[in-house]
UniProtKB/Swiss-Prot annotation:
Domain of life: Eukaryota
A single BP term in Gene Ontology: transcription elongation by RNA polymerase II
Further comment: S-II binds to RNA-polymerase II in the absence of transcription.
Positions of the UniProt region annotated as Disordered: 76-139
Record-listed Phosphoserine modification sites: 57, 81, 97, 100
Protein's gene: Tcea1
Protein name: Transcription elongation factor A protein 1
Disulfide bonds: none
UniProt domain TFIIS N-terminal: residue ranges: 3-80
Biased composition, class Basic and acidic residues, residue ranges: 76-93
UniProt entry tagged with the keyword Protease: no
GO molecular function: DNA binding; zinc ion binding
Species classification: Eukaryota, Metazoa, Chordata, Craniata, Vertebrata
Amino acid sequence: MEDEVVRIAKKMDKMVQKKNAAGALDLLKELKNIPMTLELLQSTRIGMSVNALRKQSTDEEVTSLAKSLIKSWKKLLDGPSTDKDPEEKKKEPAISSQNSPEAREESSSSSNVSSRKDETNARDTYVSSFPRAPSTSDSVRLKCREMLAAALRTGDDYVAIGADEEELGSQIEEAIYQEIRNTDMKYKNRVRSRISNLKDAKNPNLRKNVLCGNIPPDLFARMTAEEMASDELKEMRKNLTKEAIREHQMAKTGGTQTDLFTCGKCKKKNCTYTQVQTRSADEPMTTFVVCNECGNRWKFC
């Protein structure tokens, strides 16, 4: 029974990721015929999958059936406790304190992550367990929290990971605010840089690491642009630094003056060149040329 529910949940998650809900109604009908239990709800996180599908779908029949299922499962969550075992009774108060079916499903899946044996070492299904961010009535801070949550939703990774992107966005904003202590330009620039890096299509690993909890909200709030950069950009910066050091060393050691090269900028032939072995020994040396007239630099192999 659990395997069947997990299979359906995975299919729904893929539909949400691809934004293609074809066949969703059939899956919901399958779920309707499965006798659901509180244990199944908590171990499979099917509630989150159905709720994500409901939010994205524009098909009235799909949204209606999804709401109906969530409503029926809600009865399992806050139903009578006479038949529940002690473990389920412990879970009940935390679950039933939520205000909506969606929140109950998210809370149920979040609290259950630490107890699931098969998720002990699975980072891709990690749900952050940091203290909830304090609420705020500041309109600027609320807007920043919304924008951070939206950035975390880029690519729909949060669905597969099972993260609460809204709470995570609030935690990041709270950490930024606690450090800066106001909502001035420094605060706004800090938030803006987090959003830009989270939405960077060339740096999806940063977003995934934040969603998985590998990068905690308070650490992410303090990271520099260099620390948030993609591996590709870090490598590029490393190479540029090496190049700058090499050129600086060349300038100090000098070179050989020649009129064999024509400057592409000023067309003069008053140049100085230096040859350096920048690659393996069996490769041609790299020639660095500096125009003594205008300072233009170029290189060739």
